[in-house]
From Swiss-Prot:
Similarity section: Belongs to the alphaherpesvirinae HHV-1 UL47 family.
Key word Plastid present: no
Lineage: Viruses, Duplodnaviria, Heunggongvirae, Peploviricota, Herviviricetes
Source species: Equine herpesvirus 1 (strain Ab4p) (EHV-1)
Subunit field text: Interacts with US3 kinase. Interacts with UL31 and UL34; these interactions seem important for efficient virion nuclear egress. Interacts with UL41/VHS.
Protein known as: Tegument protein UL47 homolog
Amino acid sequence: MDQHHGARGGAPIRRPRRSIESRSHPFRATGNTQRTYSTPRLSYRDGLSGRTASRDPQEQASNQDESSNPSTSNAQQSTSFWGYLRRVFSDDVPAQPQAPRPRADFAPPAGEESSSEEEEEEGPAQAPLDEEDQLMYADQYSVGDSSDENDEEEDPRLGSDYPTSAESSEYHDHGEMVAGAGAESESETDIDAEEEEEDDEDDEDDMEVIRDESYRLPRTWLDKSIRLMDEALAQSSELSKAITKSTRSLYDSQFAPGGRGYTQTATPSRRLVQLSRAGMYDSDKIVMTGDYMEVDDDPDSAYQSWVRAIRHPLAMNPSWEETISNHTNPSFSTDIDYDIDELIEKNLARTPPVFEGLLDSAEFFYKLPMLYTYATITQDEAYEERLAWSNTQALHGHEQSSWQALLVYYSRGGMYVSPTQEPRGIWRRALKQAMALQLKMCVLGLSDVVTKQNATHHHAAVTFLVDALLRTARNCYLASRLLVFAWERRRETGAKRPAEPLIALSGVTLLQPLPPEVSELLEQRTFDIGLRTPNSAVFRAFFGSLVYWAELRLALRDPASINCRYVGFHLQTSEIYLLARAHSASPGYTKEELVAMEAILTLATLMLEVALQWVHVACAQLLSENDTIKAFRRVSASIPHALAPLGSIRLHDAEFEVLSNPDVMVARDETALSQALFLGYFSVRTALTACMRDYSHEADGGSKETVTGVFLGVGLILQRLAGHLNFLLNCLAGAALYGGQKINIHSLTLPRYSLLADVMAPMLQRQSLVDFWRARDNMLEDLEITPRPGPPTQGKRVVVEMPLPSDDLPDMTPGASVNNGAGLGRMVDMAKQLQHYRETIIGEEATSSVGKRGLIRAGVGVAALRGRRRK
């Protein structure tokens, strides 16, 4: 044979491509030698998981070694004519076609299962398969049926500390296969495998999985041992896995709010101390002039101009009106019988800690007659209240629970949060998983303390609520004065210049100071951070979870009780949709969803400021010797709350400015998440306005017990609203910093949120961005749910879709503005602005790499991605 051609025998020399078997049968079962040349390669959009293509890593490695060894005739496996003749006349056995390595980021996690509903309902209809297609789909799908048909049905209890099954190591095996690819021989076929691996790496770059070094907080040396135990799960027996996970759950519980290892700072942070010292000096005083101390016989007389400016009454949410009409068993404070002597014996009739030494018990409960809230709530009453919550109609049509004791059915395994093809649709599998995750994040911590320890009564929550609400009012007193002096010193330089967020807000703030004569009990010079006890740590945590406690809602009595339930349910729905649309493997949202999230964050933050000013004035009125003076006109008049949301012209104009934006109007109607967020916002707006109306009606010669109950109900709603804003902000900031998405936000939203979070510190422990995503992944792991990119696989593609946009939303938008400008600021890049709030929003423990992707994107105007996914 010609020496120039050697073993090739004169055949043309060319670089061989991947075999036709691999290209046309990427998912064919191992060992199938039948050739099929007409079947095209399917993309990831067809929902193939590649499970049958994966084999044991050791077996694959051995096969690769055998295929890379030269044959006995020293002839290469060529696809040319000469190569075909050589194989016919040689003694070599043809090598079996090898399936390509499965993509590690697309294969479903081990143990993935479907819920019973997913097994009953099929996904999108599939075209009939011919004989060739059936061969290609061998062992991958059953023709005309779901691949999840034989999965076992699991009904996990959400609060289980000892899981019955452990995670499989299939995902880790994929990682070993990837690592092993670099050790293969440098043959031509191996070069093709490396090219395919590079393509897979480019695909994986499209989704940024959060792997920041600050993702787990260092606690003690024991924490490292727990992490090592986690890493050893894949190589352990089933019993060892269960013991390891139980040990970690027990360890983490010690550092949960209220646990023995949970640390609470006893004094305000250095940032808060510096904020108050730099903004107000000991010699600073506010002198107010006017007739504010005169008796006001007709509070509405000052608001007649509103009637001419706003011609239409405020629209209330139709679902709220339906809820009120269906509330057939109201319970009012005047109907409650309680024994004062018994309450004194139980040491319940005592002054809250915030006013110890300032007011005795008799004087305090005369000003705030709230002893009826300590009356016993029976188990039957609590059950009926929880049942009323569950029976409320949700947007997605599934039952929502307000307590851990009720079962939540969901599918373990992969969680897929990609957008659906249907408008206003969402994957039902992800929705059910999000319902379980929301309960674990926002309810389980409180319900564990209440039910498992069986040591906490709703009395403790009532005491915490009134104490925290009074401390919050005192923080409003301080913040309002800091803003006044920030405006006065806005042109100062050096050490005398106030903090920049205070200067930015000082000209547009709604926190207005009260006259010193009516706010003596609220006066303070530093921010109050609230009680520091185990119970208070639990009540302050979990994004404002007290509203989920049925006994506490009932204790406040109507009208506060029904409004708290209404708000809690619809905000829970909003958070379920937020969790069902993003996770750490896919932290981004669609453009329309981001527009809606920013609009709700801006409006709800302004609404929180309006409500806190109302709390400030109402608290001063309840504690005042004379509650009919003009200084309290803001909460005594009824006309403002009949014409404007929460009785605020500023909020009215802000809603018109934001909701009339064409982009916001499109976003509101196009996605399910946007629908849930807007209905949640309008639910809070309606309930708070209704409570303020009831307060103004009862304050004029009505029941003082009802006035106190409404005041506490507003506080309970505000705790839940502030927690929801914390939740929403962390999701939006994660999309900007971890997902690298371009998000424009009003420039005054983050300064306003940061200040209000400091004001509400006695009521709510805010969670930083890093803590939020870390805790979220840990809880998903506890639920045996694995975040996965891309759409769900075949059989799990059931979509829950809203048929039409809600008719309620357009009617809730104001028809015109009253004044020019709502004080929201200009639009700025969120990723850049967040860098000024690393301590308050991102988290003190965050490294400098947090937000790097968002900043790179912000600098060039597009997402910093190395490659694009193949379609």
